[in-house]
Amino acid sequence: MSALPHFPLAAVVGADELKLALCLAAIDPAIGGVLIEGPRGMAKSTLARGVADLLDGGRFVTLPLGASEERIVGTLDLDAALGEGRAQFSPGVLAHAHGGVLYVDEVNLLPDHLVDLLLDVAASGVNLIERDGLSHSHPARFVLIGTMNPEEGELRPQLLDRFGLKVQLHGTPAPSERAEIVRRRLAFDADPQAFLIQWQGAQQALQQRCVDARQGLAAIALDDAALNEIAERCHAAGVDGLRADLVWLRAARAHAAWRGANAIEAQDIEAVEHFALAHRRRPAPAQSATPQQPSSRQAQAPSNASNGEGQWGELPAQNVTMGERRQLPGWPKKP
């Protein structure tokens, strides 16, 4: 049974920033994946599926809802290890996603340790399984795409920082764009093959551009001039750690390859700045309120304690009339 066709990325209306970020992650998966933040109905999953068609394998894997750690990383058959002297590995989601796209919907609702695991493998490109003294590893290079709706919860800052790029979708498209989006969706649903043929030229041009960019990526140097510029900007943005510098530099190189250039230029650094700093930039500290000056009436209050008022805010001493001292009768002496 053939897989259902994906809506071509070239036919998506608008969302230019998100399409660029996804293409950069497809060019260099070492960037660390893309986090898409936005409400429902913004074509996040459609765009993620479209990225898979830009990769060599074209594989698109969705993380099942409620998947356990063993389902994600795979399992080792200990009984086979004892009987045959070797570990038998059953592949998990990460093995199936190798060479393609791993899509995690509502990543902010996953347990933190699973998000951490996914980010570790996405960054290293290797999945290592260790159980009871046995270990197995396999390559797991994929483009990690996570989506989240901020109304349903946030990611911890430590996990948020580990996503390479972040794109925030907000606002509603113009009426003309809305109509065109619906028109293209209806055409695709009515006859997917005819729609794919209609957009075949634009889709193939986009695929070839990504292929050329991946092939030319290694020839573009991560030069000191670009690194120094990025380091200055990260410092000015108050970014914690060095992950932003590394991701920004890699994304700028991928953007240069996307343009077909041979070196990183200022326009490449500018083009990806928001993607790298959107979730890492620290807000400027709020200015402290100016201390209130005492009123003129308070300032003119006499401070001489001899006038009976003492310091401002203190009540003057009051003379309290005391009654006569009573003499208690003494105890009678013992006879």
Give the predicted meaning of each segment.
Residues 31, 37-40, 82-93, 107, ...:
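Conserved Walker
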Residues 115, 173-179, 185-282:
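Basic, amphipathic alpha-helical bundle interface domains used for macromolecular binding and assembly
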Residues 43, 232-235, 240, 254-335:
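C-terminal engagement/docking regions of AAA+ P-loop ATPases
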Residues 61-66, 166-176:
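Conserved AAA+ ATPase "SRH/arginine-finger" region at the nucleotide-binding site
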Residues 1-19, 237-238:
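Dynamic helix-loop-helix/coil hinge segments at AAA+ ATPase domain boundaries and subdomain interfaces
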Residues 23-26, 81-102:
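Conserved alpha-helical scaffold flanking the Walker A/P-loop in AAA+ ATPase domains
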Residues 26-65:
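Walker A/P-loop
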Residues 68-69, 95-122, 154-160, 175-178:
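Conserved AAA+/SF3 P-loop NTPase catalytic/coupling segment centered on the Walker-B
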